[in-house]
Amino acid sequence: KYLNDTDVAVFKHPERDCIYPEGKIVMDIKFDHPNLVEDQLAFYKDMCYPEHNGLYELPVRVQRNTPTTQRMGWMWWEQICMFSSRDQISFPFVCNQLGIKPSILPGRANTIRGNDIMPQLVYSNHNRKA
């Protein structure tokens, strides 16, 4: 039901729609090393990644198992290894590179009773402190 027009469905970020301001916030609150985030955002700008091209909450995603989604997983992991571990910065870039436009799951991901898909998600802190 969530994969009618695409192979991937995710939750929309509740506050922002762009990786560039998200990267600044990640640096400001020290969720990751600023040099990693700066290098990542500079690389994406050099690759002509557009502003306001979507930002997602990613504790869970719904997807089909296809060659493209398998490639997405490998490319996404490559970005996380090269740059920031903040997956929501790299995910939109990888989707864009592969021509994937995720559909949006209803509700919010990181709230109790915020959606009908995952009634409660357990939060784990996996931040690299700067």
What residue ranges belong to the model's regions?
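Glycosyltransferase catalytic domains, chiefly GT-A lineage
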Residues: 1-130
